[in-house]
């Protein structure tokens, strides 16, 4: 099994998979009579159909035991999905390019600094939320509508990957 190298989460490195949601280096302007700075259009919510709706949820995720064997990835073919950390804890992101199935050799891993969120583009393969230190809360923006919006792919044993944030 291949051990994934964990990269720092940057807009440039993550661009093939979606948006990094962060204030550093983002467009902004003052509103509310100069008392509030708006960081504008940090990500775009994607939906497949006009009748689909963007919804906001909170996911409470328990920390996973590490190192972790990455056995599966999922994708959302009908809409984007954003995860914004609410408690400021670093978390991991595992992704693979859009395609009929994820290719084990193209899987990449990133570490958020806890102030960065991610918005997975439609169809991007990704691991479910990966909290590493303790229970964490995430604001999640995704799609509600008809149709199956979650495909799962399980790797054969020889294509499984190891994720070790402490290495």
From Swiss-Prot:
Keywords: Lyase, Purine metabolism. GO terms for molecular function: ureidoglycolate hydrolase activity; ureidoglycolate lyase activity. It is an enzyme of class 4 (lyase). Gene3D superfamilies: Ureidoglycolate hydrolase. GO terms for biological process: allantoin catabolic process; purine nucleobase catabolic process. Pathway: Nitrogen metabolism; (S)-allantoin degradation. It catalyses: (S)-ureidoglycolate = urea + glyoxylate. This is Ureidoglycolate lyase. It comes from Pseudomonas entomophila (strain L48). The gene is allA.
